[in-house]
Amino acid sequence: MKKYDLSTNEISDNLRYLELLSKQYPTINEASTEIINLQAILNLPKGTEHFLTDIHGEYEPFIHVLKNASGVIKRKIEDLFGNSLMQSEKKSLATLIYYPEQKLEIVLKQEENIDDWYKINLYRLIEICRYVSSKYTRSKVRKALPKDFTYIIEELLHEQPKGIDKYEYYEQIIRTIIDTDRSKEFIVALSKLIQRLVIDRLHILGDIFDRGPGADIIMDTLVEYHSVDIQWGNHDILWMGAACGSDVCIANVIKNSLKYANLDTLENGYGINLLPLATFSMDFYKDHPCNIFLPKMDCDKKYSINEINLIAQMHKAIAIILFKLEGQVILRHPEFNMNHRLLLNKINYAEGTINLNGKTHKLKDSFFPTIDPKNPYELTYDEKELIDKLKTSFINSDKYNKHVRFLYSNGSLYLKFNSNLLYHGFIPLNEDGSFKKVKIADKEYKGKELLDKLDMLAREAYFSKDKDDSDNKKDIMWYLWCGASSPLFGKDRMTIFEQYFIEEKETHYEKKDPYFSLRDNEDICKKILKEFGLSSPESHIINGHMPVEEKNGESPIKANGTLLVIDGGFSKAYQPKTGLAGYTLIYNSFGLQLVSHQPFESTEAAIKEETDILSTTLLLEQVVNRKRVEDTDVGVTLKQQIDDLKMLLNAYRKGLIKQQNKI
């Protein structure tokens, strides 16, 4: 912080700003008091950050991990009641905190002496609440309190019932809560307050959407969350592109949903009408088996044989439309360097084969009633009409657009936060580790400049009013989804067509960007950090996107701890590969911890049987001196505010600004 005594010239240079600041702090006393308050905050322990990534619609385990704070709440219970409660009591108390409304329903049916139960658990919850709130200012805790119980909870948190008078006062408050039949509401309020206080900031490193059945539920949760940021993943950007009105992104979103038989998010979550697609697919593929388009049934929902066959027909119909639309985008943008993905013109439609790289492959399905071999990328009249109907449904969904606007307002391609660099995918590199140049329009970008440019273009695609250039702006969203140099994808190609239609596995290969072989090199990682203005020895890159195959010995800790990959397999589709069901990275005042999670059974089992996710915590880094608010980004801002207030004090004392004392 700056010196306390400043020259008249220094103050005069900032006089206009200080006059504005004096409106908020009109006297020496008020400015001094605020300096004292801010200085006190700087000395508090830093808040706890939680990092999660690649949730892929798996809303039940995601919400449970938020509720149990990746095992932190269980540890708090152990800290306080480790020697005074039985294991069964600790499990019940934890479940009450995670799911207070549902647990209370069960207790009310089973408990004979409910008033005693209320009293015991109110005392326990208050003790936990006092414990988890101790690192925050009263003001911050007050802002987190429910309005109905603000005064009472404040009294209970800050009273220490040791003296006789205080004990009686404390006990009378509890008794009155029970007597006025407000125990249930009070328990719910305390439980949710505990959940809120144990996670000060939530970071979501992308891929909220696709595969799992509840991306809309996850988004509802995030919209209401007290402090969250999002680093967009390629699956998120696809849904954002669909909201921009991009035909190719809309087709991709629907194709991905049908691939995993995940219609709930589209139809029930967002009210997207898929009936026109169902009608279209039955018209063109009614008597065609569409076997290679049968969905992957990872979801718990049961479908009849007829429903599965219809999903397969819809899947094929939208996939063919998608390949046409992708071809149109590639032809519009030679700078994307994606001509190798123009495949429909390489098919021999008479023989049912395709020639790739000089080799002819037999297609597993060669029934293409909507493709004109002479003009394979042109949509038929019916296909154009279908896409227009689907686009109208996407654009007019209020809830969907509310969620997309939240992704824009709370999200970005990358984030620098508390000396860490957060991004979902990767930074494009050359084989020698230098930053890869990527051409956008008529200019080349690399490193941080590339991500900044693409972030700006992603925002323009949704918010721009320029209708004449709207297609080009929307096309960048598709490139971010699957482009070879998109910092969200990371492979030279996305071989969706080959995986559908060609048996030979070598055609399915997708070469990864050099980043993924170089990210274990500490010098490379430090070079990336430096590119983004981070040079602290305590800085880390926190990364998602590529699942860590821990069961095969892969470590999430790269480059001597400089880079941490935290995609552990929230998505059920990846759990056989990872051997886990996700990671949470926790950064608190004591250091960094990586928590690995085993698969979550169900919310119902968590409530009725009091089962919890089995989590294992690995201590990555432990600091010698506990991290304080002054060591964080918030601390930098507070120090600047203190400097400004000290300058204001100087201005008052030198008579350059008059105090506004009330008479």
From Swiss-Prot:
List, in alphabetical order, the Gene Ontology terms for molecular function in this entry.
fructose 1,6-bisphosphate 1-phosphatase activity
Q: Which residues form a coiled coil?
A: none
Give the originating organism. Clostridium beijerinckii (strain ATCC 51743 / NCIMB 8052)
Q: What is this protein called?
A: Fructose-1,6-bisphosphatase class 3 1
Instruction: Please list the reactions this protein catalyses.
Output: beta-D-fructose 1,6-bisphosphate + H2O = beta-D-fructose 6-phosphate + phosphate
Q: Name one GO biological process term.
A: gluconeogenesis
| Keyword Manganese in annotation | yes
Q: Under which main EC class is this enzyme filed?
A: hydrolase
Is Manganese a UniProt keyword of this protein? Answer: yes
- Its EC number is 3.1.3.11
Q: Which domain of life is it from?
A: Bacteria
To which pathway does this protein belong?
Answer: Carbohydrate biosynthesis; gluconeogenesis
Family assignment?
A: Belongs to the FBPase class 3 family.
Gene3D superfamilies per UniProt:
3.60.21.10
UniProt entry keywords in alphabetical sequence: Carbohydrate metabolism, Hydrolase, Manganese
What cofactors does the UniProt entry give for this protein?
Answer: Mn(2+)
